[in-house]
Amino acid sequence: TYTHAIRPTDDGHCPFLINKLCHIHATRGEHVKPLICGLFPYSFNSTPSGVYLTVSFRSNAVLGNAGTPLTEQIDTLKEKFAVYNTLYTARSVIWDAIKLTVDKPITWEQYLDYEKGILAALTREDLSLKEKIFAASDSLFKDLNKPPMPDTIAPPKGLDKKFLAGLFALYFPNDPKYLNKDVVFNGISFALDLALKSPKFKVVNRSYSFEELNNFPWPENNAESKEIDDLLTRFLYSRVFGKWYFGGGFAQLSVIAGFHHLALLMPLMRMHAAGLAIARGAAKVELIDVMVTVRQLEEKVQEAVLDGYSAALWELILF
């Protein structure tokens, strides 16, 4: 969402961060900080129905669901939006080619109706996170012919695992030199990787199979598991509400492909968090592993760029 940034140090941190505090803020006050720092963690997305505000999950307060509710910060948010407009007046987001699928264009008003179904599914308290995602996906197919859901979900096939491994390598690069680089999907090289490379997932300099990470224990039916589900649900809800997953909000993908990409981020985060837990010597995934994972993914996914071939490939695989 941002086109300007302060160049980070080799360890990925701001050069003005000292003892986990902003040196400029601590010594000179908030009013002299760079404008881009003052905007964090707010993100503004201008759409045909208005400006939608979300907050970045790179913020510790957002990750922990702490701080003052946005509804109680209206005056501050108006000031932040005015600053945002001074930095990004030249940036235009194109929303005039919205599609439910590649061959089904829809109006913005029709999209908002579909979005209601997604958000309603994500806020259902009687469903697990997986069931919420399935229900949200089903709501997008209400006007399409969708094959019935099988009684049991088959394990991922070879191509599915390769696609996940390709996305995993781009969103969670193991080489530190790629941590601070934007994610650029080259369709041809991505397709070659799908065909030629075995599906391996690297976390903290160790390679794992899909099964090793997917089968690693997670907390179940306790307070921590609820916190994890809440964090992941909030992440999904924020991307949908902010329109950061399709069209002008993400690589001009169709709504269905864009949402299914969001859905795929869940197993990617599950595997990365498992890898972090294994590296710590833990017996199961803990909330801290998921928080670190969500923060890294947020940074990468918000700056992802797809070329035309990649977008076409995603539309095919993610329908």
Where are these regions (language model features)?
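Residue-level preference for alpha-helix termini and adjacent loops
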Residues: A5, L39, S43, R58, ...
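Short, charged/polar micro-motifs that form catalytic or ligand-binding hotspots
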Residues: T27, K104, V255-F259
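Internal, well-ordered alpha/beta segment that forms a basic, Gly-enriched binding/recognition surface
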Residues: R28-L127
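Structured, beta-strand-rich domain cores
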Residues: Y2-E30
